[in-house]
Each structure stands twice: as C-alpha cells, then as structure tokens.
C-alpha cells in the first residue's frame, strides 16, 4: 500500500503534515503552539522534531479533555528563594477560568531537619519538590499539565543557579510520571518545560513598538530599543497580563484567549474596581511587595494562558489532519497551511493591541 494511503494516528499525522509544510509555515506553527525557539539553522528537521515532541504532550491532554470535559493547566516559575504558580481550568469549549495565582517563599517549611533554607542535599531538594506539588492543588480526577520555568540570570551566584536547576529537573521528573492516586491506571500529571523564549515569542515578538516608543515621554532615544530587549519584552508582557485581566474583570471576554474570572476574583482585585482601562499596576493589584514579584507572577499567568490557547490551536489542527484518518491529501495540506497562517495573523493582531499602551508606560 502506498504511504499516501496509510491511515495514521494523531501525532504521526501531525508529523506528516509538518514534513509536507515549508520552513516558514513550521516557524509560524512553532510560534502559535508556544514552542518557538531561537533556531540557529534553517533546516526543517530539528524544528519539526521539537514540535512533534511537544504535540505528543498536548495529545495526551487533548484526549483527557475529550474524555473528561475539563483539564487543569499550571504554570510554575522557580527562583532561588520562592516559586510562583498559576492554575487555570479549561473546559471542552476552551473557556478558561482562573483558579489560583500565588507567590510562595521558600521558607523553613520547604527544608528538612529544622533548617531555615533548602540545602542542596538530595533529601532536601526532593522534599521541596514534593512540597511544591502538594501546594499546586492538582486534581486527582482530572488531567493536570504543569509548565515549568526557572529564573535565568547571569547575576545569580552558582549555588542559586544550581538549586533552581535541580528543582526544575526534579519537578519535571515528578510531574511527568507521578500518579496523584494509586487507583488511577493513567498518570494524572503531565509536565512540559516552558522556556522564556516560548513565552516571549508568543506574547511579544509580533508587537509593533517603534511608533509607540516615539510617543513615550520617558524615552529620549527610542531607536535604542528593539523588540528583543528584555526591558521591552517585560513591559509588553505586563501590558498583556493587564489587558487580559481587565477584559475578564469587565466581562468583555477576549475572543482569542477566552479568560474568565468568577465573582471571587473580582472581590480579590479591588484595584480593578477603582480604575479604568489599564490604569493600574500588577504589583498593587496583586498586593505584591516588589516589581520583581510582579514579573514572576506575570510569567506564570502568561505561561498558563499560553497553554490554554495552545491546546485549542492544537485541537483544531488535529481536526484538520484527521479528516481522512491521517492520510495525506493535498487539499488537507492546504487547509493545514491556511489555518497556521490565520492563527499567526490572529496572534499578530492580538499583539498589536498592546502597542497603543506602550505610549504611556514608564520604561
């Protein structure tokens, strides 16, 4: 039988259409699936292989969503002295609800033998990892995807970098295969590493900045700033988080991201009640101590929100490639390519909405 006529399961079918797509389409696909890395070569194979490995994780999540009607998504951001996390629930209509959002310091309760801080001894790092998982609020009756990110800074000393690396590896290993209850045959925890470049590309890379920065009174030489500058990306991400919170708080649900806040959150965010538009700071809104805390909370919020949108995009791609049981068809390839281009355009239009707010922020 010709390979063209073979039926395929979902992930091999995704792989097939990625092979048939051109490199430009694969780069767009990487972005809309929040998997865009700064590739240093122009070959399809490494991009495709990485994409397919990411799709394999989302395929498990998609199957659970089909079977159970809801899944939990978590974003975790590890630093040397704390961790931040965000929890959202996605239903089978891809409406997304914010469930929990916290920053928790690594105090003595994360250490063993009455130590005041986490040591690098294996029992301590393992204990801290299990404590983190226990605080996330995973649901034994639902699938839970944990996206893990750690602080990356040249200013961190070696022991702090080592601790973050160890916790990241242990958390990934524990979430990748652990069962929340012994009665379930299938693991209820899934894990994915969330590199900062994924989040930056998904929320920032297509944002037009030049015209807005020229009108920003706090910037004397706007030409000095580029979209890849960390300060610009951090500013854009804060703007995006505020846009999403404001639209959800006002029940003006963004059609692309579909975030919802229940009444409980509206009581927790009094700052949003007393302000209009984006005239508030995340630091004050979330009752945080420092701007660094606000940055960490923004990272986990946007990582979790990106997972929700990625799951919906991936599910739509599955519907396309499985129209003929995974067989190759040139008409389906065109639909695949067109959908990727349209989703990239949708993301570009969403990012463009952040540009206007760059005129008034202090950079």
Swiss-Prot record:
It is found in: Mitochondrion. The keyword Chaperone does not apply. The keyword RNA-binding does not apply. It holds the Pfam family Ydc2-catalyt. Its main location: mitochondrion. One of its GO terms (molecular function) is DNA endonuclease activity. One of its GO terms (biological process) is mRNA processing. GO terms for cellular component: mitochondrion. It comes from the Eukaryota. Function in mitochondrial RNA splicing in the excision of mitochondrial group I introns aI1 and aI5 beta from COX1 and bI3 from COB transcripts and thus would be involved in obtaining the correct structure of the intron, to allow the RNA catalyzed reactions to occur. This is Mitochondrial RNA-splicing protein MRS1.
């Amino acid at each position: 039988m010709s390979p063209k006529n073979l039926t395929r399961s979902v992930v091999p079918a995704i792989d097939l259409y990625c092979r048939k797509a051109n490199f430009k389409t694969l780069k767009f696909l990487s972005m809309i699936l929040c998997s865009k890395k700064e590739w240093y070569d122009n070959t399809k194979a490494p991009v495709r292989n990485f994409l397919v490995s990411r799709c394999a994780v989302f395929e498990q999540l998609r199957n659970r969503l089909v079977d159970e009607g809801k899944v939990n998504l978590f974003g975790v951001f590890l630093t040397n002295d704390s961790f931040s996390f965000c929890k959202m629930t996605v239903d089978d209509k891809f409406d997304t609800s914010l469930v929990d959002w916290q920053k928790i310091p690594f105090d003595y309760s994360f250490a063993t033998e009455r130590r005041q801080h986490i040591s690098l001894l294996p029992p301590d790092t393992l204990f801290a990892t299990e404590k983190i998982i226990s605080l996330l609020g995973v649901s034994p009756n639902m699938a839970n995807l944990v996206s893990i990110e750690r602080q990356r800074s040249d200013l961190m000393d070696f022991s702090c970098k080592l601790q973050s690396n160890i916790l990241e590896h242990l958390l990934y290993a524990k979430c990748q295969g652990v069962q929340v209850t012994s009665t379930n045959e299938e693991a209820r925890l899934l894990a994915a590493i969330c590199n900062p470049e994924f989040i930056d590309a998904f929320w920032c890379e297509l944002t037009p900045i030049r015209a807005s920065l020229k009108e920003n009174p706090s910037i004397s030489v706007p030409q000095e700033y580029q979209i890849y500058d960390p300060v610009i990306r951090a500013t854009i991400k804060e703007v995006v988080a505020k846009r999403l919170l404001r639209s959800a708080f006002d029940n003006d649900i963004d059609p692309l991201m579909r975030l919802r806040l229940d009444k409980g959150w509206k009581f927790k965010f009094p700052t949003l009640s007393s302000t209009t538009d984006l005239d508030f700071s995340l630091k004050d809104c979330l009752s945080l101590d420092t701007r660094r805390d606000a940055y960490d909370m923004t990272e986990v919020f946007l990582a979790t929100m990106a997972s929700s949108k990625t799951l919906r995009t991936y599910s739509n791609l599955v519907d396309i490639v499985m129209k003929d049981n995974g067989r190759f068809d040139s008409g389906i390839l065109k639909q695949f390519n067109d959908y990727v281009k349209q989703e990239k355009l949708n993301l570009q239009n969403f990012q463009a909405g952040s540009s206007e707010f760059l005129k008034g922020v202090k950079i």
